[in-house]
Every structure is written in C-alpha cells, then in structure tokens.
Amino acid sequence: FLHPGSHKNQGIEKGLNLIVEGLNQIDVSNGQMICIETMSGKGSELGCDLNQIAYIISNASIPLYVCIDTCHLFSSGIRLDSFDDYLDEFDKLIGIEKIKVIHCNDSMMPFGANKDRHEKFGKGLIGESDLFNVIFNEKLEGRPIILETPNDLDGYKIEIEKIRRKFHELREN
C-alpha cells in the first residue's frame, strides 16, 4: 500500500508528476502489486480525490491499483451513506476493477476534516451502518477487507464478530 505523499507547497501538478516519476522507477516484474491508498487530504497531501488518483494511475508506466480507506474517504469529504455514488464515479474515472482492497475503520474526526484519525469499528463518527455500506457493497464483493482500527487482539475479535453477525443477518434476509 502506498501513501502517495505531499507536494510540500510545490503545487499539486508538480507533486503528482514527482509521484509518477518515482513510481516509474519501480521494477514490478516479479508480480508485485502496488495499491495507492485513498488519503484524507491533510495539508498538502495528495491522493485525496479521484482525479489525483486517476492522474497517477494513467501516467505511471507500471500497473497500479487502489486501496480504499474508509476513514480517509470520510475525512476527505466522501459520504459513505451514498457510497454507491462514489463507486460509480470511481468506475467512470479509473475503473472499479482497480480497487483491490479496503482498509475499514471508523473516524475520530468529523466529516470533511481532512485529518487521519482512525477509530474503532462503529465507535466513531462514520458509524456501523455506513461502514456496513462499504463492507457489504456488491460492487466490491470478493475483495479483502483489513480492519485498521486502534485495537488489541480482543478488540479485533469483537469487531470481526460484529461484522460476521451482520453478514449472517444479511444472508438470512
């Protein structure tokens, strides 16, 4: 997973071109998969909107993919209660097949705050319902989901059980 980085006040275009230049130096001949992670947009951070990610993917000479991070999306101003709209736009600009993995976590920070502060599943400002919108979205079926919540092993166990219960509930209905 690649956090694209920041342009450090050099401008978005220059920053994106430097990222592409760096990526073009990577040898992926052994089958490595590089996933650009969606970002929250703090400071001069890049990769917080689809146009920036599309630019990087379309200008790099190596195959690139995407990791969607729920906290980062929420913090960058993407509503997860209308996640299908985001996926439709993603598909138009980049292609939904480029999404390879989801980092699932709640957010300590309010919507659109452009700050990256992960919270335990369902304990933050995104909430369980919107996180389930992402986890159980049919357009993303079969992709791995990684819990990136601030937790210990027992906490992860509780979160996994919560998700598992919802999965079984949805299958029964």
Which ranges hold each PLM region?
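C-terminal helical cap(s) of enzyme catalytic domains, especially alpha/beta-barrels
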Residues: L153-R171
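Acidic-residue sensor for enzyme active/binding pockets
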Residues: E37, E148, E159
